[in-house]
């Protein structure tokens, strides 16, 4: 199917474009971008007046829960949620059941995605066998089978010598290491951010040092091995400072944060709200401010959701025993657009963090509207108003702290390889 997107505000940081243009998609590829183009007779015409046309958004950190945990989410529902949120590609973390630590499981995910997924699915393999932090997984075979990175996400690689070797091997194979940076000894029995709110609620806290100490270690190991590293889901002002300083020294470090870390504080936990329980935990106002500054000054490269679906039975329990994690694919875009409204970022920089940089970090041939590129396109209605309602979410799980909240901004169309996979009602 050929598609002609007419008169939208095209924002493509990969080409430094921000102007009203037409876009022609032919045979699943970007054919032409320009002013006053003529629509071919056989093309579906999309009138994009008043809408934003961007490279397809890429979420480099999601949990699709397949294989083994499909009662929370699966490839179909997870990629439906991605498409509804404007994402044309997702990278899925390996903490499935079994863990994606070998080529058989990677191949299963790749083949299932080819058969069922609405968007591109790029698997992330485990750093260590079973993500147990004892022996390295076969990174070469993981890459060969289709993994775009390795991570033990959900838990840190506690052994620093093992992490050093992981970085060295991954560098040799051209595989990105995504670090879940957390010092478990400092986390202890903590269930939320250590601070005033935790004290008031009588809950055990997780100090900011649990993140900062681990981020510092991982950054120094990357510097020592002269290897690239990507730090997942940073949430503290200290992490921002450590990574900013490391970049200034020339360390090959990139990082991401999630919308909840610039949209909420630990106040959201009041009332023992388990849908506001995640790891790392929601922090304090000064951390939120630091995350926004880090996004604005380029310290933070990407916005990723850490979409972590859980069944109601795993969330509708006492706060101490509720599982960590929230869904985020369908709320990420409006929450991130708020950064533009608040003048933290301009629109081009936001698209860079949600499409261009994730593609670059993971080595994908996406995140651009250049001629010949795969036609992954997100068309955004920045003024669409809607309310987050559980029954209207595509995700199988409904564990969002934003339920009931009014949102502004939504994906009007999501186009993957030249095919419309989502159209807003």
Swiss-Prot record:
Keywords associated with the record: Hydrolase, Metal-binding, Pyrimidine biosynthesis, Zinc
Cofactor(s) recorded in Swiss-Prot or TrEMBL: Zn(2+)
InterPro entries on file: Amidohydro-rel, DHOase, DHOase/Allantoinase_Hydrolase, Dihydroorotase_CS, Metal-dep_hydrolase_composite, Metal_Hydrolase
GO CC entries: cytoplasm
Catalytic residues as annotated in Swiss-Prot or TrEMBL: 306
Enzyme Commission number(s) of this protein: 3.5.2.3
Enzymatic reactions: (S)-dihydroorotate + H2O = N-carbamoyl-L-aspartate + H(+)
Gene Ontology molecular-function annotations: allantoinase activity; dihydroorotase activity; zinc ion binding
Pathway in which the depicted protein is active: Pyrimidine metabolism; UMP biosynthesis via de novo pathway; (S)-dihydroorotate from bicarbonate: step 3/3
A Gene Ontology BP annotation from the UniProt entry: 'de novo' UMP biosynthetic process
Pfam families: Amidohydro_1 (PF01979)
UniProt: Zn(2+) 2 binding residues: 153, 180, 233
Binding site for substrate: 63-65, 95, 279, 310
Source organism superkingdom: Bacteria
Keyword rRNA processing: no
Record Gene3D superfamilies: Metal-dependent hydrolases, Urease, subunit C, domain 1
Cofactor remark: Binds 2 Zn(2+) ions per subunit.
Residues that bind Zn(2+) 1: 61, 63, 153, 306
Signal peptide span: none
Function summary: Catalyzes the reversible cyclization of carbamoyl aspartate to dihydroorotate.
Homology family: Belongs to the metallo-dependent hydrolases superfamily. DHOase family. Class I DHOase subfamily.
HAMAP family named among the record's database cross-references: PyrC_classI_B (MF_00220_B)
Protein name (record): Dihydroorotase
Organism encoding this protein: Geotalea daltonii (strain DSM 22248 / JCM 15807 / FRC-32) (Geobacter daltonii)
Gene: pyrC
